[in-house]
């Protein structure tokens, strides 16, 4: 029996501090200019390399229990057994317990190692658990495609690869959950095999999706073009807390781009110029002042989405009323987030929002990730 190699990599969620849509390109994509940041909230991506001949790359979505890392130990056992015995891994449960009380997850006031800030007992459910069963399978799954792309580019035969994802980052949220999972696969494999430079890894990532190059390294970055031209920016001051809320609605990203294109055609559209939002954010980041960063947060899709889902503006107003330095939509939604300079203020805001929003979570902004 071949020896198995078991790799685990964190896949951190992202937020848009700004998102400027500059116009449609000839290739059908839109030129973007935006500032993005990483948060501690993350999925765990586990890979098992090495299996008998005929065990091809496979994938299974799992649900991360917010209270424990036991899922990873189970994942390692199940994946090793699947590859060595050539059997199917048991199906993951469709739901997980709600966010649990402090007694189950450690001392209040300590950020857990999964990037979640412990909160008091609540009936709030985790949308990651509800959506894990809906993750694309086979070639439709970006993490599996990332593994295959890496092996193809490196000319490596891993002797089989099993990919399993423990979901925490909500799906269809504008937090690049799928792209982050793919980036985590590329990072984990490159740490193990060391086949590529950072630049080459970005090229492989861009072939998978526009957000993957950013998600490879994360941190605070200016992204331009489709999102592939990246410029590292100063980290936010210590103590940048985030409240995430995900209302119960869904939107079509192509439809939002279409509506935004029409809005921009109006004579009164964007009087400040197409890049003014991001320019203001760059000035705030260089100054290193968290209140200025909060005040500069902006997203071109927010006014478009507000026409279809008024709860977006309602959540932003409530976050600001609870002390957020700024509140904005990330990506094309549906997560709205507030920036706070204190965990106590963030938790008070989260408690207020939980009465009306099905998913509320507290986390922190994190620095860039190293690949080597």
Where are these regions (language model features)?
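ATP-binding N-lobe of GHMP and related small-molecule kinases
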Residues: 1-173, 191-195, 236, 246-249
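Solvent-exposed alpha-helices and their adjacent loops that cap or buttress functional pockets
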Residues: 2, 37-38, 155, 206-207, ...
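Residue-level signal for inorganic ion chemistry
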Residues: 17, 45-47, 143, 178, ...
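DPxDG-like acidic metal-binding loop motif
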Residues: 143, 173-200, 214-216
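Phosphate-handling active-site elements
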Residues: 152-164, 188-208, 342-355
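Glycine/threonine-rich beta-strand-loop-alpha-helix active-site module
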Residues: 194-233
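Conserved, helical-rich catalytic subdomain that frames metal- and/or nucleotide-binding sites
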Residues: 217, 222-326, 341-344, 351, ...
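Conserved glycine-rich beta-strand-loop-beta hairpin in the small C-terminal domain of fold type I
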Residues: 334-335
């Amino acid at each position: 029996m071949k020896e198995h190699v078991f790799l685990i990599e964190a896949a951190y969620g992202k937020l848009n501090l700004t998102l400027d849509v500059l116009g449609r390109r000839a290739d059908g994509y839109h030129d973007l200019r935006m500032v993005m940041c990483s948060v501690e909230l993350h999925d765990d991506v586990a890979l098992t390399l090495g299996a008998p001949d005929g065990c091809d790359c496979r994938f299974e979505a799992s649900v991360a229990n917010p209270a424990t890392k036991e899922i990873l130990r189970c994942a390692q056992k199940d994946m090793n057994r699947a590859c060595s015995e050539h059997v199917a891994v048991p199906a993951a449960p469709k739901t997980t317990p709600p966010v649990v009380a402090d007694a189950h997850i450690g001392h209040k006031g300590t950020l857990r190692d999964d990037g979640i800030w412990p909160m008091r007992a609540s009936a709030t459910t985790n949308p990651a658990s509800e959506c894990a069963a809906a993750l694309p399978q086979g070639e439709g799954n970006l993490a599996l495609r990332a593994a295959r792309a890496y092996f193809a580019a490196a000319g490596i035969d891993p002797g089989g690869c099993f990919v399993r994802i423990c979901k925490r980052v909500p799906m269809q949220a504008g937090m690049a959950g799928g792209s982050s999972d793919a980036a985590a696969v590329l990072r984990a494999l490159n740490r193990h095999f060391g086949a590529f430079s950072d630049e080459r890894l970005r090229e492989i990532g861009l072939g998978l999706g526009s957000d993957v190059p950013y998600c490879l390294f994360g941190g605070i970055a200016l992204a331009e073009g489709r999102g592939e031209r990246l410029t590292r920016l100063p980290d936010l001051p210590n103590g940048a807390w985030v409240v995430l809320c995900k209302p119960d609605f869904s939107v079509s990203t192509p439809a939002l781009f279409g509506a935004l294109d029409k809005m921009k055609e109006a004579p009164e559209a964007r009087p400040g110029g197409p890049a003014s939002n991001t320019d203001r954010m760059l000035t705030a980041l260089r100054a290193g002042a968290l209140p200025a960063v909060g005040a500069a947060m902006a997203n071109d899709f927010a006014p478009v989405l507000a026409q279809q889902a008024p709860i977006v503006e309602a959540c932003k107003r409530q976050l600001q009323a609870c002390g957020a330095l700024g509140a904005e939509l990330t990506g094309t939604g549906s997560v709205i987030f507030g920036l706070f300079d204190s965990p106590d203020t963030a938790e008070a805001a989260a408690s207020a929002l939980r009465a009306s929003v099905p998913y509320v979570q507290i986390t922190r902004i994190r620095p860039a990730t190293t690949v080597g």
